[in-house]
Amino acid sequence: AANPGEHFGLRHVRGAEVIDIRDGEGTYLKEFRSRTQRDDGEPKQVVGTKRVFTLALDAAQYQMDTTREQEGRGVDVYGRLNLLVRRQAKENNFKAILACIRDLMNVDVVVPEWLHDVFLGYGDPSAAALLNTHEALKTIDFKDTFLDEKHLVESFPKFKVSWTNEAKTRVPPYRVTFPSPDDEAPDVIRAESYVPPDPGPYPEDQPNVNTVRFTPVQVGAIRAGLNPGLTMVVGPPGTGKTDTAAQIMHCLYHNEPGQRTLLITHSNAALNDLFVKLLQRDVPARYMLRLGQGESDLDTEMRFTRAGRVDAMLAKRLEILAEVEKLADSIGLNGEDVAYTCETAGYFWKIHVLAKWEKFTADFAAADAADEDFVRASFPFAEYFADAPNQPLFTGTDRVADMSRAKGCMRHLKTMFTALDECRAFELLRTQGDRSEYLLTKHAKIIAMTCTHAALKRHDFIKQSLKYDNLVIEEGAQILEIETFIPMLLQKNEDGHSRLKRVVMIGDHNQLPPVVKHAAFQKYSNMDQSMFARFVRLGTPYTQLDAQGRARSELAKLYNWRYETLGDLPNTQTGAYARANAGFAHPLQFVDVQGEESAPTPFFYQNIEEAEYVVSVYQYMRLCGYPAEKISILTTYNGQKHLLRDVVNQRCTNHPLFGAPAHVTTVDKFQGQQNDFILLSLVRSKTVGHLRDVRRLVVAFSRARYGLYVFGDHGLFSECFELAPAFETLANYPTALELCVGEKYGACERETSDQGEKTVVENGQGMGALVNAEAGKWQAEQMTRNR
């Protein structure tokens, strides 16, 4: 076969880096991206269709080409180049990351002193974990972590709880004071319930409250994460790593309002999951910033890019200024330009609003204590709050309760003017670039990005003087050592010291490690060992979450043998978890497929029999009424993924009933995600292949909530020693697919122990025939309806 060069007529291929692009008038295209304006205020327009690229060539290759040309052994390569091809950006970040690593080698940067020895592998491995030392926080405000008094007591089984409140008033939130290592009573903690200040009279003033009943181990992880130093959390599949991380960040935001937190993950999907959880908590959206390309996948109406946050701040400014004008009218300042700018509104706050409030509080203190109607009669902003729900605001019969309500109204105004003051910088800064830089370096309290984005943009962050105090790393076991190291150094040192106060690493070293494609680096340099896994090996203390709430207990048995203690949360025994999967006799099965693997190109493994069987089962599920978004098809090889997609496109995508499933992808790509039902194709029929790595097996078997159906060569995989514990569980189920034909999704009340009337499917052809018969019935029903 002809090589690609001969096939496509290529003579020379050279690599280059694009420095800049200009239009027909020689204007840099970068200017269009930053939305610079012409003198008349209109955005600049691109002129003409001609583009001029300035390229940085490979100097060594250029020298070789020119030498060869001068010696008469070659031609002028660069004068003959006539096609410019841009590489896929996702695969093309190596140069920027290499430049970042070189920068780190050439500058004097330091990790925090408390992390130094552990990072290098010296000394006491627990030295960076400050939880059990004198440096640990003595009193922690857990905010809404605990749902009630019983939850708090259950969360600290090793401690006796001493209350400072009477029994009637022990409602959340709580502050907890922990004993020092040398206290007289080291097993007693003091708990205090307190009443948070009234946030205001409007529904939007009320904070979103946590509804997750955290386990004692999760509470221990939250406590460790709030303390300074290094916190390691090992989270097996489904144990609530994301909820725990979100609660740590929520409490950090409230307990350390002056600190900024950097959130790093390996994948965009994990970053978006965590970001959405934070949005559901009591963290104002204006303090959250999402950097990188995956923001468009966020399942939210708000935009969290720099441009999106800047636009939101400007919109917020107009919204609050309208409220300021309404407030001014309500106190008789009609016609005055108090709401013209943020600055004039600030003067209005100090001169009029604060002055009236201070006079009111002074009069309240001086008034007769028996005058219960004072607040209702004298509150200066009653007209402004006339549209608040639950009128009247003040009863006139309880002086203390009315004053508390008045303070809530004032807190609403203070929050409003504080937000307006934060908008002032966006009013003064005129260009989008200046505004987004201010947002990143001064305004945002929680900044989220992937580890790749951190490496790509480190130079920009240093130049912009980014500062942060806390670092939270999710999916820590999937991130390369260097990619974990770089986020610690995205800011300048302060007097030769790192500003970093906390590093929280969350991950699972029993699942897949970082991907290293270069075999020599992987095998001989140990480069596929993450910093998270290295710290665990060194003996650094970690908290291992011990209760999973994702999968049925039958499914969890496939992988919980890999962990010391991994139990099930109560929710896995009720509701949909207790009911059988409609149309299936069992919640999980290994379906023996007598297919032959093939490899059209080396290492591109496919198995057509398995692919057709899997897609037939997907079609059967759709005929039973299963939603397509609840089903994912996974496989262990890229070749099979492409084959499955071809079969799905041919049979399902354009069909009015079937449609495409939520995902058709590889196990490796699906790590960190989950779905209700998983169809898994193992492909190989000659050797076990890379499923022999038990970490990949754990990922593959732990993605499903309610149903897992594995398709493969049973004789081959059941003989594999490494996979034996999982296959002992699968051995309890038959290797021929057993169905309960006629059941419908959502209408099946059968319990998992009841296998119903079983129909045994012997092979893929039998499954195909069953699907064709059921599809024929469905088509006949549609025709009858349309008559």
Residue ranges and their predicted role:
Residues 2-213, 300-388, 395-408, 534:
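Pre-ATPase regulatory/linker segments immediately N-terminal to the P-loop/RecA-like helicase/translocase core
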Residues 3-9, 17-36, 41-46, 210-213, ...:
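Beta-strand elements of modular eukaryotic interaction domains
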Residues 77, 93, 97, 111, ...:
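Alpha-helical interaction elements in eukaryotic regulators
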Residues 192-315, 428-430, 434, 438-565, ...:
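ASCE P-loop NTPase helicase motor core
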Residues 199-207, 418-424, 471, 680-686:
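Short, basic, glycine/proline-bearing loop/turn elements
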Residues 291, 367, 381, 545, ...:
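Hydrophobic residues at beta-strand termini and immediately following loops
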Residues 350, 357-358, 364-469, 479-483, ...:
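Conserved helicase/translocase P-loop NTPase motor core
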Residues 452-456, 461-787:
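Conserved helicase motor core of SF1/SF2 NTP-dependent helicases
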